[in-house]
C-alpha cells in the first residue's frame, strides 16, 4: 500500500471520494440518456444542421469526430438550451443539465419537448420515495426521517416537508390501489395465505393477521390482488376480503391454493361451492410432524416427500396408500391427519406435471412473508394495522420485490383432470 493510499484510507475521506465518483457517473449516465432521447425526438445528432431546404448537409458533431447527415424529412425541431434540475436517488443528490427543445407541429407552430426520463416535477426516484415512506410508516416522525436519511442523500436533501409529500403520495396510491377495478384482470388461479404481525393498538402491542391474496393471470404472471389487516383468519375475515374483490370485478378462478386454515376454505366454498382447492403440502407436512414424537420427524418428512414428489399421479396415489398403511401402525395420529386433508392435498396431480411445483404450495406468498419480516425485524411492534398492510404492499409497488411467472404457465389453459380413484 502506498503512502498516498494509506492517507486516503485514514478517516472517512475515502468514502466521500467514492460516493462523489458514483454520483458523477450517475449524473453523466442520466444526461446521456436524456441526450439520446432528444436525438430521437429531433431526428438528428446534436450540432447537425440543414444547409438547404431539400438537400442534405454534413457537419462534424462536437466531440464525436464523425460526420452527421440530416435531411429536411428527418429534422423535427430545434434545441433550446438547457436547464438544471436536482434529482435525488439512492445514489444521492445530483444536479442534471436537462436539454430543452422545440418540436415542429407541422403547421408552422412549435411545442416544448418533454422528456420521459425525468417527468416534469419529479425530483426523487420511486425507490427514494419508497424508502422515505417506509421510514415514516415504520413509526418515525417526519423530522427524524429527514435527519436519518441526510447521511444517504446529503444535508438538506430530505426535509420534513419532503417526507410529508412522499407520505401523502404513497397514501394516495395505496387508497387508489385498494379501489381499483379487477374486471379486466384475467385471473385463473388464486393463492391465499395469512401471516401474523405485531402492531400498536390502543397503546398496547397486539398480534393481528395480514391476509394476502395473489392472483395468477392466464399468461402465468403473479400479481398482488389484496393485502388486508384483520384480527384473525376467521371465515368472516376472509369472506369480507373476498367479497370486496368480487365487488370490484374478480371472477371465479379455476383453482385456489390455500394454507389449510378452515376459515379460509369455508369462505371460498361459501362463494364458489365447486371451486377446486389445493391445500399447501408444506403446511401439511408441518402439521403431520406436530402429531408425532420429535424422534419421528425426519422419517415422516422422508415418507411424505417421497409421496408428494413422485413423478406421476399414479405413483403419488400408490405412495399415499403406502404412507397410510405404515403410519396407521406406527403412529395413528399421523395417518389420521393425512386422511383429514383428503383429496384437496392432491389436487395438483390433476394438473400437467409442469405445473406441480407452483401449484402444490403457497410458497409464493411464504417468500413474500419472509422478505417482509426480514425488513421489519428490527421493529418488535409496527405503528398500526394499516401501516403494516401498506408496508407489505409498498415492497411490491416500489419494485423492491418482483413477482415472476408461475412454473408451467404455458399449460395453464388445460382443464383439471379427474382425480384417481384410490379404490379402483
Regions found by a protein language model. Give the residues of each.
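Short, flexible loop/hinge motifs at secondary-structure junctions
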Residues: 1-138, 146-172, 176-188
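Conserved beta-strand -> loop -> alpha-helix junction used to position metal-binding or nucleic-acid-contacting
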Residues: 255-262, 267-303
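Short basic-aromatic helix/loop recognition motifs at nucleic-acid
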Residues: 133-140, 356-361
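Amphipathic alpha-helical transducer elements in NTP-driven molecular machines
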Residues: 15, 19, 23, 27, ...
Amino acid at each position: 500500500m502506498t503512502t498516498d493510499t494509506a492517507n486516503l484510507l485514514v478517516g472517512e475521506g475515502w468514502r466521500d471520494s467514492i460516493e462523489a465518483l458514483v454520483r458523477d457517473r450517475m449524473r453523466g449516465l442520466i444526461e446521456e440518456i436524456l441526450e439520446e432521447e432528444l436525438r430521437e425526438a429531433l431526428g438528428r445528432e446534436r450540432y447537425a444542421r440543414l444547409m438547404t431546404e431539400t438537400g442534405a448537409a454534413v457537419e462534424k458533431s462536437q466531440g464525436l469526430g464523425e460526420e452527421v447527415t440530416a435531411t429536411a424529412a428527418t429534422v423535427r425541431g430545434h434545441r433550446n438550451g438547457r436547464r438544471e434540475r436536482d434529482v435525488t436517488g439512492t445514489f444521492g443528490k445530483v444536479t442534471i443539465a436537462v436539454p430543452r427543445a422545440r418540436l415542429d407541429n407541422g403547421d408552422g407552430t412549435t411545442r416544448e419537448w418533454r422528456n420521459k426520463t425525468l417527468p416534469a416535477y419529479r425530483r426523487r426516484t420511486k425507490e427514494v420515495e419508497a424508502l422515505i415512506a417506509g421510514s415514516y410508516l415504520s413509526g418515525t416522525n417526519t423530522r427524524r426521517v429527514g435527519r436519518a436519511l441526510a447521511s444517504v442523500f446529503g444535508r438538506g436533501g430530505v426535509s420534513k416537508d419532503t417526507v410529508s409529500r412522499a407520505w401523502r403520495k404513497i397514501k394516495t396510491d395505496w387508497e387508489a390501489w385498494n379501489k381499483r377495478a379487477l374486471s379486466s384482470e384475467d385471473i385463473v388461479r388464486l393463492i391465499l395465505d395469512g401471516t401474523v404481525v405485531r402492531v400498536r393498538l390502543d397503546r398496547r402491542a397486539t398480534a393481528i393477521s395480514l391476509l394476502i391474496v395473489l392472483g395468477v393471470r392466464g399468461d402465468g404472471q403473479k400479481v398482488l390482488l389484496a393485502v388486508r389487516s384483520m384480527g384473525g383468519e376467521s371465515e368472516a375475515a376472509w369472506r369480507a376480503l373476498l367479497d370486496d374483490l368480487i365487488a370490484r370485478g374478480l371472477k371465479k378462478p379455476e383453482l385456489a391454493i390455500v394454507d389449510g386454515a378452515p376459515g379460509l376454505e369455508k369462505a371460498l366454498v361459501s362463494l364458489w361451492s365447486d371451486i377446486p382447492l389445493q391445500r399447501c403440502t408444506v403446511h401439511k407436512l408441518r402439521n403431520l410432524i406436530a402429531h408425532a414424537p420429535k424422534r419421528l420427524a425426519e422419517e415422516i418428512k422422508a415418507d411424505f416427500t417421497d409421496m408428494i414428489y413422485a413423478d406421476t399421479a399414479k405413483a403419488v396415489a400408490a405412495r399415499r396408500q403406502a404412507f397410510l398403511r405404515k403410519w396407521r401402525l406406527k403412529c395413528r395420529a399421523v395417518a389420521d391427519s393425512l386422511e383429514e386433508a383428503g383429496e384437496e392435498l392432491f389436487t395438483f396431480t390433476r394438473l400437467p406435471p409442469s405445473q406441480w411445483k407452483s401449484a402444490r404450495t403457497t410458497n409464493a406468498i411464504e417468500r413474500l412473508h419472509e422478505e417482509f419480516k426480514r425488513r421489519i425485524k428490527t421493529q418488535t411492534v409496527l405503528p398500526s394495522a394499516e401501516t403494516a398492510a401498506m408496508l407489505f404492499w409498498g415492497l411490491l409497488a416500489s419494485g423492491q420485490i418482483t413477482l415472476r411467472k408461475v412454473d408451467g404457465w404455458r399449460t395453464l389453459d388445460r382443464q383439471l383432470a379427474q382425480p384417481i380413484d384410490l379404490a379402483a
